[in-house]
Each structure stands twice: as structure tokens, then as C-alpha cells.
Regions:
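A short glycine-rich beta-alpha junction/loop motif
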Residues: 66, 80-87, 118-144, 275, ...
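Sequence-specific dsDNA recognition surfaces
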Residues: 9-19, 23-58, 197, 211-267
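Short, conserved charged micro-motifs
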Residues: 94-100, 303-309
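A structural connector/turn signal
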Residues: 50-51, 76, 120, 132, ...
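Non-catalytic DNA-recognition/assembly elements of restriction-modification systems
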Residues: 1-21, 132, 136, 140, ...
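Short, ligand-facing micro-motifs at secondary-structure edges
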Residues: 25-43, 61-83, 87, 98-102, ...
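Hydrophobic stripe of amphipathic alpha-helices that form coiled-coil interfaces
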Residues: 164-167, 171-174, 178, 185, ...
């Protein structure tokens, strides 16, 4: 039979078999379990749904009709149950299932279907529209050859992507290790060191000293004024020097009109999230701004380079110190109060050395980010 364009509904049938999940012993797949654009199932435990599910068989193709721009398409290799937000498409004998999967994953097809959605908050596509989309249907042997070729290419690209992702991971790991060695004095070659008696930093250069955090910083709680921007904070990068945009602010501060309970931070001030300090949520501000009441804000009490202490406190040994000082029954309830933070013993290099170390740490991380960005761009070209 020569190749032709056909409406999808003439080559695949939308199945409508639904059951209460309690009435089936089939494994369940939600849209959240399908990786966008690849059709792969994501690893990890899957939630068990309440209510009704759709039933599918081996060879059926699942298509996520909710937010179709996410391109959630999966070719079933075993029978199961899925979210009713997925269309269950059963190819006719003239349409190869793997070929149909790739047809539906075509970016132009996804754009076409996405343009048809209805509903502002929960945009959905309908089978009425999707079924009327025209698809190119070559001979079955050609379909199989196309699908096999795309399977091979996808596998090859997946291997390349995995290799590059490992490179990025290793790059960041090495950069963080280099920073940890810098801030703890492990890279000071040819100089005498002394034992500290502390597990988290056993030795330091002999010309460094040790002081508790409370001797280097003191807690401040300057009330926020309305004109100060709300700053973004990350467990990965510390305090950002940019103001949250309207969308981020609405999401992160929950539309609080009166932010008088927010705390001022000034350039050089240290701030940490009481509930996430054990994850490394600590940073130094470079601008005037405001942070959530969930943050402890501390001002230097002596002439020191605060950025050095940001890098220091974000290393694994000092994150562990903050975790040990936190109070709470479980991890998600842990809180690090100033009374415990102030007791942490911190190394104190000479001021100029603090500045030099912080500058080197910034260069290490910036170089890693630059190389990682090049790798990510190369992945996008695959």
C-alpha cells in the first residue's frame, strides 16, 4: 500500500475502558511518571491513585492530554492502569505502535495539539481534535524501519547525554572540593599546621586562629522598610543580588502585603534559613534587601571578609555542624537557632588571606559553571 496521509482516528482507536483503581491489580502510571519528550518511565516509587483509572494493554500508546506541551507520550511494554488524563490509543494493524509514538513526539505535532487546548488553569486537548490530525502513514515495513532507526539514534544520544551529565557532575564536584580545600587551609603548602582537636576541621595553618561564630558575627533584626527589595535565596548559590520578579515574589512570599516582619540585610551581612541551614542555605548579601522572618541575619563584629565565611559554611563539614546544632524531631522540622549557630568554631585566616581565598573560590566555581554551560549547550545540539 502506498504512503498516504490519514486522520489519526482512522489508524488508532481511543480506548475508554475505565475502572476504580481498587478494582484492579495493575501497576499504575501517572503523567508525572512519564519523562517529557522521551516516552521513558521515570524511576522511583509511584503514587497510588484514588478513584478511576484508564486501562491499557501491551502496545497501546499513552498520550498526556493535560498540558500537552509537556509531550508525555509512552509506548506500553506491559499492561497496566494510567491516569484518566492520558489518552489510551490502540494502533490499528496498519500502524506500528513505536512509529505512532514518534509521530506524537514530533515537536510540530505537539505544537499543533497544544494550540487546540481549552481551559486556562488546566489546559487539555481533546480526542476530537487529536483524532482529526493528519499523520503520514507509509507502508508498515517502512514504519518499522523508521521506528528502529529512531530507537537507535535515541539510544546513542542518550548515552552521549549521560556521559556529558557525568562530566558536569564531576566538574562541579571537583570545584566544590577545591573550594573546601581552599577555605580550610588544606592548600597552604609548605606552612606549619596545628591540630585543633575538632572533628570538622582537624588541622589549620599555624598562623590562623579559631573563634566561635558568635565572636565573629552578632545577630541583628533590623525591621524591613517597604522600599527594600525581597531577595531570592538558594541552597545552591546563597543570597542572590537581584530582586525577585513579581511572579517569584508572589510565589515565595505568598502575596504578603505587609512585609514589616521581614528582616533587613546589608552588604556583608550573613543570613541563613533556620529550617534549611542543614542543607547549606546560607549566604552573604552584596546589596541592601529584605529576607523572610525564617532567616537569621548576622552582622560582622570585626574586620573580616564575609564572603570567605559563605564559602566556608557551605562546605560539607560545616553544613554537618549546622545540622548537628539544629533542633527538631525529623529533618524537615530541623531549625538552627542563633544560640546554636554562634557556638560553631570557625577558622580565622588573616584578612588579606580571607579575601584571596574567597577570590580563588569564586574563580574555581565560575570556571566550573562556564565549562558546564558549554557542555549543556553541546547537549542541546544533539
Amino acid at each position: 500500500m502506498p504512503a498516504s496521509s490519514k486522520r489519526l482516528k482512522y489508524s488508532a482507536i481511543s480506548q475508554n475502558r475505565k475502572l476504580a483503581y481498587s478494582e484492579t491489580d495493575r501497576a499504575y502510571i501517572g503523567l508525572e511518571d512519564i519523562e517529557s519528550w522521551t516516552g521513558r518511565l521515570l524511576p522511583g516509587e509511584r503514587a497510588e491513585p484514588e478513584g478511576t483509572v484508564s486501562i491499557y494493554e501491551v502496545g497501546d500508546v499513552l498520550f498526556g492530554k493535560l498540558r500537552p506541551y509537556l509531550a508525555k507520550v509512552h509506548l506500553a511494554e506491559e499492561a497496566g492502569a494510567c491516569s484518566t488524563e492520558a489518552l489510551v490509543l490502540r494502533p490499528q494493524r496498519s500502524l506500528h505502535p513505536a512509529y505512532l509514538k514518534y509521530v506524537l513526539l514530533d515537536p510540530k505535532r505537539i505544537d499543533e495539539i497544544n494550540a487546540s487546548t481549552f481551559g486556562a488553569q488546566m489546559p487539555r486537548a481533546s480526542w476530537d481534535f487529536i483524532g482529526n490530525c493528519k499523520i503520514f502513514v507509509p507502508e508498515l515495513t517502512t514504519q518499522k524501519a523508521i521506528a528502529a532507526f529512531l530507537d537507535r539514534e535515541t539510544a546513542r544520544i542518550d548515552k552521549l547525554i549521560a556521559k556529558k551529565e557525568r562530566q558536569v557532575e564531576l566538574l562541579h564536584k571537583r570545584a566544590k572540593q577545591a573550594v573546601a580545600e581552599l577555605v580550610t587551609g588544606a592548600t597552604v603548602g609548605g606552612m606549619a599546621t596545628v591540630e585543633t582537636g575538632l572533628d570538622h576541621i582537624p588541622r589549620i595553618p599555624a598562623h590562623w586562629s579559631l573563634l566561635r561564630a558568635g565572636h565573629l558575627f552578632h545577630e541583628v533584626a533590623e525591621p524591613n522598610t517597604d522600599d527594600l527589595p525581597v531577595l531570592s535565596v538558594s541552597i545552591h548559590t546563597g543570597i542572590s543580588d537581584r530582586q525577585l520578579d513579581d511572579e517569584e515574589r508572589d510565589r515565595k512570599v505568598n502575596l504578603i502585603e505587609d512585609r514589616s516582619s521581614y528582616k533587613c540585610v546589608r552588604p556583608g551581612y550573613l543570613a541563613y534559613n533556620m529550617m534549611r541551614a542543614w542543607q547549606g542555605a546560607v549566604g552573604v548579601s552584596t546589596v541592601d534587601g529584605a529576607v523572610s522572618p525564617a532567616y537569621v541575619v548576622a552582622k560582622p563584629t570585626r574586620d573580616l571578609h564575609s564572603l570567605y565565611y559563605q564559602f566556608l559554611l557551605r562546605t560539607p563539614p560545616f553544613i554537618e555542624q549546622m545540622r548537628q546544632g539544629s533542633k527538631g524531631i525529623t529533618d524537615f522540622r530541623l531549625r538552627l537557632y542563633w544560640e546554636q549557630f554562634r557556638l560553631i568554631m570557625l577558622p580565622v585566616p588573616p584578612l588579606e588571606e580571607q579575601r584571596r581565598i574567597a577570590a580563588e573560590a569564586e574563580r574555581e566555581l565560575a570556571h566550573a559553571d562556564e565549562v558546564a554551560a558549554r557542555i549543556v549547550r553541546s547537549v542541546a545540539l544533539l
